[in-house]
UniProtKB/Swiss-Prot annotation:
Assembly notes: Monomer.
Catalytic activity, EC: 2.5.1.19
Binding site residues for 3-phosphoshikimate: K25, S26, R30, S171, Q173, D324, K351
Gene it is expressed from: aroA
Protein name: 3-phosphoshikimate 1-carboxyvinyltransferase
Keywords assigned by UniProt, alphabetized: Amino-acid biosynthesis, Aromatic amino acid biosynthesis, Cytoplasm, Transferase
Matches recorded under SUPFAM superfamilies: EPT/RTPC-like
Family: Belongs to the EPSP synthase family.
Catalysed reaction equations from the record: 3-phosphoshikimate + phosphoenolpyruvate = 5-O-(1-carboxyvinyl)-3-phosphoshikimate + phosphate
Amino acid sequence: MSNNIQFKVQPGGTIKGRIRVPGDKSISHRSIMLGSIAEGVTQVTGFLEGDDSLATLKAFQAMGVEIEGPNQGNVTIHGVGLKGLKKPDHPLDMGNSGTAMRLMAGILAGQDFECELIGDASLSKRPMKRVTSPLADMGARIDTAEGGKPPLKIHPSSDLKGIDYTLPMASAQVKSCVLLAGLYAEGETTVIEPAPTRDHTERMLNGFGYPVQSEKLDEMQTKVTLAGGGKLTAKNIDVPSDISSAAFFMVAAAVAEEADLVIEHVGINPTRTGVIDILKLMGADITLENEATVGGEPVADVRIKSSKLKGIKIPEALVPLAIDEFPVLFVAAASAEGQTILSGAEELRVKECDRIQVMADALVAVGIDAQPTEDGMIINGGLQKAQSAEIQSHHDHRISMAMTIAGLNAVSEITIDDCANVRTSFPTFIELANTVGLNVTAVEV
């Protein structure tokens, strides 16, 4: 496959139909990790066959775990127990995945073998001190490149100690890393988060029979506690559709004329539904149908119709609950009447790229008044028709997909560069986009 895939987006019709987007990336990663260190056989359905979660799968195979699949989203994991992983004979390549690297660091910190975690050029620029620092407090020994960046060289350690750790930022990845290291630590490990973040790790640990206590300290803070030395028992996992992937089509339907779209079996974990809450505050016509709980995770069909969106000041409490969805929420803001203000989102600057600056540049290129700020953006919306432009995605899958949605209401073709990384999270994106009424082609250049 060519390194440069361009998306060419023609202005399209309306958005209609029923679709199911691929499995949730966060839950897919965790199903492999916990299934591998559980005792017994775990069957996973709905697994996301994207590059990121496949990197996690291959890493555990390299550490001696027998994993069959994926075959149409079905994976069988023959767990080896907490102490059953073997030293891999090569560095473990996490590709583009910050989630994989940070969570794996927690599991590997308590092993009795040395291991190195590496990643692609983008991942190699991302901050890892946020996980290596608390792990060092627990007794782990981890070497990093300059500035606390990957690769991570993790030395053997069999005497981790539990810690009480207050997160300096709301980060599910850091919280999960510390909790996973806590499985291997003596005593209790406690993490206090300053604002709610996704809780898939805690839910899945409880599902595997490993007790985790969560206690609300106040409206924002939560304390999560587990004790080391237990065991995980295999459990089958049905991975719901990824709300982060569904978000692109939610916005597409909201901004298109005469749209009516149903996205099936979407994970609506309350720590992930910030995108729905924000769109509703903007006036989006969104309803949940067929609500159910599957394997401890709430799911529903999400129905979205054409909406007259208005600009809002996005509540900072919702920022951690929609952190991955802001690129496409910026596109919604561009179509909304009035001003949208985002603050408290400095985390966006250290994602796969600086998503604040890159999205501001992309929106300006298509004719939007978008002003980046240190921790967010100010967008003056009301755009009826986006201008034709060539957009630089900076190899960021979510920028590529967000600007594809911006092309729905353009005057003529929008070209987006460097879209190969869309396959990390949403390999069927173009196919589904064209199914519901967009007009997108991928071209190797």
